[in-house]
Amino acid sequence: MLQRAHKHSSPFASTPPHTRQKEIGEIMGRHLAVELLSSGFFEGIDMLVPVPLHKKKEKLRGYNQSEWIARGVSVITLIPVFTSGMVREKNTETQTHKSAFERWENVDGIFRVTIPEYFSGKHILIIDDVLTTGATTVACATAFDKVEDIRISILTLAVAE
């Protein structure tokens, strides 16, 4: 299901990720959840799974913006955030200046589910900050291919045009 709460430019668009404060992600996650709550979008979702950063990138940045967006969504929906079931195995280059094809190549096979049995029989909501080509979120969802009886939905804060 594709549902747009509002069509606005992202408040993050003009600032590089490393200069953003994590609290902004949580606030935006709360606002997003409030906008979607009455639509039934969150019904049946068992857990929120933020798109993971590579541990080196997260250490350098100090936080994972998708995790903080997920935390904000969780405050409103009371759906738990689960951050330890998937890892980003490759520290890829930034996607900012890549073509659509290069973005898909850059993220191919970079995620691994570490606890597949935990997700079996669950409906998870993968949360990312910005959807551009969909390459990252599809790569993330594809990592769950071997998990039995899983349902996956995706939520992003912003869609780049």
Indicate residue ranges for each PLM-predicted region.
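Active-site-facing substrate-recognition patch
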Residues: 1-47, 54-71, 75-78, 82-123, ...
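PRPP-dependent phosphoribosyltransferase catalytic core
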Residues: 125, 135-161
